[in-house]
Amino acid sequence: MTTDIENMFKDKVLGHPAGLFVLFFTEMWERFSYYGMRAILVIFLTGAISGNNPGWGWDTSTALSLLGTYALFVYLTPIVGGWLADNKIGYRMAVVIGALLMTLGHASMAIETPTFLYIGIALLIVGNGFFKPNMTSIISKMYAGKDEKKDGAYNIFYMGVNAGAFIGIMLCGWVGEKIGWSYGFGLAGIFMFLGMLQFYYAQSIFGSLGDKPKKIESNTTNTTSKDKTEEKLNPFSMLDYSLIVVFIVSALIFIINDPLSKIGNINTLNFTIAGMSDSLFFALVAAITFIILLIVRIPRYTRIERDRMIAFTIFCLFTIFFWAAFEQAAGSLPIYTRDFTDRILEGTAGTIFKVIDLLVTVIPMLVITYVLVKLFNKTFSKISLSNVILGISFLIVWAIIIYKLYVEFQATETEVPITWFAILNSLFIIIFAPLFTKWWDSKYNPPASVKYGLGLIIMAIGFGFLAFAAKDIPLGAKTAKLSMIWLVLAYLFHTLGELCLSPMGLSYLSKLVPASQIV
């Protein structure tokens, strides 16, 4: 393993192993497909069933329920996928399996029938479970013993995340809105497939890194067990187990019944208690049970661990509220954009937008293409087929971009696409992330609690702009013509809030968790 790591560090691109940039582009195509599909899902489902590009005419609550269910399982399945990769199949095989399943998922959604929509979403969920946790695991193994380089590696990797989100939303969104929804879903699948092939044929560059795990020697296990016994344990009591069972059962009932009742009109329980629906009742039971479990268990820790667990719980609560609000970028915000925002630009305003659109499209792509050329120079002789596939992917992207710009500049009327606003998040991250990094590295770096508070407050201000803009819309109105500036401000403040909370969130939470709780 050590030899493989040293060999990878011999061929460097921008000061890092070429293998990092193989992962960079693989992750970029996966995020392209994920954010591209997500950008058009709700507006497709809730779109009018007539017109040049008809949707399915779902009501908003049904569409958002499907999106929420998808998001829930997207965050749950990596637990299983990570375990399988760690113990059974290896990181690289998990990535390939996940990418293939997600390719099939996007292809299914492109067929545009309810059955294939559900099959597609199920495949995306399972594929994400295999793919998502194991990309960062490969990076972690790649930089074993080189901690001074690891932060820079993750920064580069997450630039790939933002690049993929930016390009995916822009192209899948435009193709879906202007040409056809199935083409938008299909485009996401095409690039997921190309990303899988690019990674598959580049595996030789990693050596044995990420291979199927070998059997762990018993002395390692014994040492680990001995170390853990030195920690003061907090064993589970019968009351703890009972509360856990009630929580799991109630949560599962809610997870299964809520989407079935809203999407499929299949209500497996069909009762109300104190005015609450069955799904809401079990969600409340699960929440209360979990709170009781925390109240019962936390006081049994030692004083230092207890204080850390209390702080950890509070910060987790803040994090849940933040991301629940932030994820509206895929749910309620596209509907707000479509139905309540004036997106028509005339005369000089239309021309200015076209120029801005050209610049924000072409400049990031030129930067990413430069990185591609650097990778080619270092690795073409070793992983030529992977690089050819990657080159073809970029040619397709550039062709779509040129066609998109040509169509937009030829149009006599300028209508800003609904999905265009969603790219602002990635754009603002690229612009402001260096400034926040300098702030965090300066003597004025605030404590984590202040950063969390700032993140939540700034996020709230973003929604405040939208609420202020909509204050004069009559109750029950189906459409309105609000200025686009309110949406731009909302996305700006949401991004600033994310930059306050997200980069340090996981790191800070990991420091709060007692050592005995880390597996």
Question: Which ranges hold each PLM region?
Answer:
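Central cavity-lining transmembrane alpha-helices of secondary-active solute carriers
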Residues: L64-A85, K132, F166-G168, I423-K438
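C-terminal ends and interior cores of transmembrane alpha-helices
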Residues: I97-Y118, W398-E408, I457-T479
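Glycine-rich segments within core transmembrane alpha-helices of 12-TM secondary carriers
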Residues: V74, K149-E177, G184-F199, K354-V360, ...
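Primarily marks hydrophobic transmembrane alpha-helices of the MFS/SLC 12-helix fold
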Residues: A94-V95, Y452
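A gly/Pro-rich, aromatic-decorated transmembrane alpha-helix motif that marks the paired
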Residues: R38-I40, I79-V80, N162-I179, I461-F468
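Extracellular/periplasmic helix-loop-helix junction of adjacent transmembrane segments
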Residues: F44-T77, K149-G152
